């Protein structure tokens, strides 16, 4: 390359950096976008490969990943992670993000991932590298990138989940490439666990105290606290006692926690230590201060909130009993496409929250995004039902469909409210026997409708035993809320065999998606702690899952229902030619 061409090339690179810098208000001077992979070098490993092997490589997952993931990664999202000071240009962000996605796609450990990056040409090809080993980075560089990503998300909890933003951009691309319809969606939640060990209340108490003790300089500790530094003391403390002594042992830990917190009084640098803050939180959640005794007394087991601390190492994890099983960790809520004509289905939205968050709360938070995606019909189970959420969904242009309902079912030996003629759900017009009420009323404040009927007529009515009216001294009366009318309306739709069959069929496969995330991508038990890290990892795992679905599309593994649907309209089956 001549001198003039080299100068021109460097001038273009510098202008590219300056353009990005000006776009972000001079926020970064040394961020460099990695687009060199778009121009192939004349001499590279691919050019020296046997044509048959090169053709096979072009048809492999690596080529799909490069085209539909790596080339679609928006590096500009990650500009705020880098300092504006002059310094060495960043290692390519799209390579780091690509590596994270491949890690969860292939279920690699970090050690295996780095080896594959160094010596596996498919991995290099997927990351836009055409010569094996052409880009080296120290292991520490990858860990520092993860640390920046985590800390930035921690400091901007409401606006800065960069992995989620990347998920949204890639999802939009996947939908466009596969020609997916998003008009129908299904939703389900599942329980996931962070990298913590399940233990009883006493084990938790010991771990909290031991972490707090280790966080203090040994010179501050007295003999009663120093013993918790011994490696073999935990076994003696937890297991060498009778069942009847457990509560007194918990009280002993409570007393030690009080003692430890007194040692750090007046020392802000120690009080601000996360381990000490965990001790303070544990004390307030697990004990009550009795002023008369001037002492912290351990609470009974039933007095402990489900939002209380569950692990000394993960302050965000919560407890929930669901489906007869005990869960510690988080809830993951998924929204997935489910239109019959779609060749494959992908996850279009997700949310991770404390597992004490109800399905209704998560659905309510997802409605704006569902509307943005163009969802018109949403299929869920009964855990997502409430009259208010149905109204809220309708306000977003979404019709709810339920496979079942939670709560108490109406008595089967009583006439349904729908057998009464009710005008606008505010006024009783006729009873099932076609009798008009003496008077009817609607209370707008509480949404209760009432109607009074003639006692003589009701006494002679053949439907007396199954009617919902209550007999009084001078008349009969019926009270019903608008919520009850709405609920009954939904229940009647569910009991319609055809509608229920369709709804169940539409929703059922999302259970398989949950299973795939847990089995194929190890989402059931994550290797990180804290809701922020769990959210970043879950985002990478769901992108990996969606890419698997996209790969199925390109391989012609089309859903049977989609084949029938496309055949009906004579559209054929979409098969990629690239």
Predicted regions, residues:
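Charged, often Cys/His-bearing segments associated with DNA-binding zinc-finger transcription factors
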Residues: 2-69, 464-467, 471-488, 492, ...
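Basic, short loop/linker segments at the boundary and entry of helix-turn-helix/winged-helix-like folds
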Residues: 59-98
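Short amphipathic helix-turn modules centered on a small-residue break
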Residues: 77-83, 125-132
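Short, solvent-exposed segments of well-ordered alpha helices
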Residues: 86-90, 104, 321, 534
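Alpha-helical support elements that line or immediately flank enzyme active sites
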Residues: 95-107
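Anion-binding and metal-coordination hotspots
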Residues: 109-112, 131, 135, 143-578
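DNA-recognition alpha helix
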Residues: 113-126
């Amino acid at each position: 390359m001549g001198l003039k061409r080299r100068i021109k090339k460097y001038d273009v690179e510098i202008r590219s950096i300056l353009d990005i810098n000006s776009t972000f208000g001079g926020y970064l001077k040394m961020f460099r976008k990695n687009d060199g992979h778009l121009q192939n070098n004349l001499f590279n490993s691919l050019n020296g490969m046997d044509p048959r092997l090169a053709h096979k490589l072009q048809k492999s997952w690596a080529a799909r990943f490069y085209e539909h993931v790596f080339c679609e990664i928006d590096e500009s999202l990650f500009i705020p992670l880098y300092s504006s000071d002059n310094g060495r240009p960043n290692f390519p962000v799209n390579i780091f993000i690509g590596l994270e996605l491949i890690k969860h796609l292939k279920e690699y450990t970090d050690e295996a991932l780095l080896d594959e990056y160094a010596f596996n040409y498919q991995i290099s090809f997927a990351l836009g590298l055409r010569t094996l080993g052409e880009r080296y980075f120290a292991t520490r560089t990858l860990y520092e990138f993860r640390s920046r990503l985590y800390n930035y998300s921690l400091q901007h909890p409401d606006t800065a989940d960069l992995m989620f933003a990347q998920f949204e951009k890639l999802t939009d691309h996947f939908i466009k490439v596969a020609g997916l319809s998003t008009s129908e969606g299904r939703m389900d939640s599942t329980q996931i666990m962070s990298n913590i060990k399940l233990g009883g209340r006493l084990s938790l108490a010991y771990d909290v105290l031991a972490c707090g003790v280790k966080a203090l300089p040994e010179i501050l500790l007295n003999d009663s606290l120093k013993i918790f530094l011994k490696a073999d003391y935990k076994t003696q403390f937890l297991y060498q006692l009778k069942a009847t002594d457990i509560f007194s042992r918990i009280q002993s830990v409570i007393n030690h926690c009080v003692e430890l917190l007194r040692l750090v009084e007046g020392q802000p640098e120690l009080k601000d230590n996360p381990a000490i803050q965990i001790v303070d939180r544990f004390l307030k959640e697990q004990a009550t201060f009795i002023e008369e005794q001037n002492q912290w007394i351990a609470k009974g087991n039933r007095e402990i909130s489900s939002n209380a601390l569950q692990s000394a190492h993960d302050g965000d994890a919560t407890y929930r009993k669901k489906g007869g099983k005990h869960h510690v960790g988080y809830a993951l809520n998924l929204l997935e496409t489910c239109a019959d004509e779609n060749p494959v289905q992908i996850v279009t939205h997700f949310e991770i929250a404390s597992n004490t968050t109800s399905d209704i709360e998560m659905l309510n938070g997802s409605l704006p995004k569902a509307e943005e995606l163009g969802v018109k019909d949403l299929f869920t189970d009964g855990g997502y039902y409430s009259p208010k959420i149905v109204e809220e969904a309708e306000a977003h242009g979404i019709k709810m469909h339920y496979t079942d309902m939670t709560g108490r079912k109406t008595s089967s030996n009583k006439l349904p409210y729908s057998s009464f003629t009710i005008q606008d759900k505010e006024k009783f017009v006729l009873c099932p026997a076609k009798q008009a009420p003496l008077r009817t009323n609607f209370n707008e404040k509480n949404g209760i409708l009432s109607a009074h009927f003639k006692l003589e007529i009701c006494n002679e009515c053949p439907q007396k035993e199954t009617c919902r009216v209550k007999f009084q001294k001078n008349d009969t009366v019926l009270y019903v809320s608008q919520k009850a009318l709405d609920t009954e309306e939904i229940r009647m739709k569910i009991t319609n065999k055809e509608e229920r069959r369709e709804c169940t069929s539409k929703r059922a496969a999302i259970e398989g998606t949950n299973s795939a995330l847990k089995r194929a991508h190890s989402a059931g038990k994550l290797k990180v702690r804290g809701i922020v890290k769990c959210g970043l990892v879950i985002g990478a795992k769901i992108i990996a899952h969606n890419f698997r679905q996209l790969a199925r599309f390109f391989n012609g593994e089309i859903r049977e229902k989609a084949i029938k649907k496309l055949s009906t309209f004579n559209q054929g089956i979409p098969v990629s030619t690239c």
